Amino acid sequence: MAQLVGIVLVSHSERLAHGLRDMLVQVAGEEVPIEAAGGTDDGGLGTSYDRILVAIDRADRGAGVLVLTDLGSAVLTARTVLEDRVANDAVLVDAPFVEGAVAAAVLAGTGAGLEEVTQAAVEARDVRKL
């Protein structure tokens, strides 16, 4: 099977990140590398540089990594991690956390490239619910 784009879910809540990951695995399958990076190292609400870094490295299977965040400071922490990484194969995407993640995971499962998967996440912002 071809290398698939990885997805990292950065949330202030460990439970939220893992819950969304569980949903994505059901939708896109186990083959898509999806990692959750939620909460702080001591189990509280917040974000962790180390958790994000480890999640990106785990999700990176050679086709690039899409990083999605829930709220403001998660963006700052994820951006810092990406700036510090030697490899530049991961991108931080301004997309809705849940809808963007679902769109990205489904497309990643088809073998689409990082640019296409990123675009799917971004375009999820325009999908109306009602």
Language-model features: locations:
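N-terminal loops that bind phosphate or other acidic moieties
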Residues: M1-L130
